[in-house]
Amino acid sequence: MTTLRIATRKSPLALWQSEHVATALRQHHPGLEVVLVPMSTRGDEVLDRSLAAIGGKGLFLKELELAMLRGEADCAVHSLKDVPMELDAPFVLPAILERGDPADALVSNLYATLQALPLGARVGTSSLRRQAQLRAARPDLELIDLRGNVNTRLAKLDNGGYDAIVLACAGLQRLGLEARITARLDAPEWLPAPAQGAVAVECRGDDARIHDLLAVLDAGRTRACVEAERAMNRALHGSCHVPVAAFARWEGEDLFLQGMVGSASDGRLIHAEAHGSPDATEDLGRRVADGLFEKGAAQLLAEL
């Protein structure tokens, strides 16, 4: 019997996503034994500073990648929005699963919508992208850093530290917490992080056997969308240090990509969009990035 070892973070959401991948692999490969290898990452351990301040979302990957290099795991499961735009050699993403809900969620115990929040309400989020869009919609809000896993963030809200918090819909849904969604923050008015809602599986590119086992899970239509979003982000040199949003959807046989760059300090937002072929996602992403640059994105990004 063949055994496949999946490196995963220890958070409830990461474990859910890894078990979701494991279940799908068992269905596609009867007789395959799939085991999880839970690991702690620096991104999980340092919670008193923003991700931008401690090195970015790549901190969620490094320990898992080292486990693959040491032969302790065969692959790793990630939220694709946490995966850097450029992977270090020899790593590849043979599988991007069908995307979950890409939207953000406003979660509040007292107020039904973003506009219903009282003047100066305390809203928790550490995402610069979310902060920029919150500032644009409600300049009066007091935005407060909020780190930790989904349950930790909800507990901080429930303990009275915030009037509302902003989380990803997909994370709440995957943990059976959809009832906590107070209001959806949806495209086109509110854009998600590039690849938000998508789960990816990473492995060594030089391990053909593992690559082939994983590739059966790849969802082509989702891959086209998130590759266009990530191409735009790459062209902008975006990271968690930069308030960048992107969302691609299918329109007939083409993709429609919306992009945004914002300022978390004053809520200025710049938008651009374009249609393109799903066979030319790099070009589509670059064209939307060019549209953002033409509207002043370079100047805005230089101020960060």
Curated annotation (Swiss-Prot):
Role according to the record: Tetrapolymerization of the monopyrrole PBG into the hydroxymethylbilane pre-uroporphyrinogen in several discrete steps.
Record text on subunit structure and interactions: Monomer.
What the entry lists under PANTHER family is as follows: PORPHOBILINOGEN DEAMINASE (PTHR11557:SF0)
- Name one cellular component (GO) term: cytoplasm
Name a single GO biological process: protoporphyrinogen IX biosynthetic process
Concerning PROSITE patterns, the annotation shows: PORPHOBILINOGEN_DEAM
Going by the record, the broad EC class of this enzyme is transferase
- InterPro entries (UniProt xref): HemC (IPR000860), Porphobilin_deaminase_cofac_BS (IPR022419), Porphobilin_deaminase_N (IPR022417), Porphobilinogen_deaminase_C (IPR022418), Porphobilinogen_deaminase_C_sf (IPR036803)
Name of the molecule in the record: Porphobilinogen deaminase
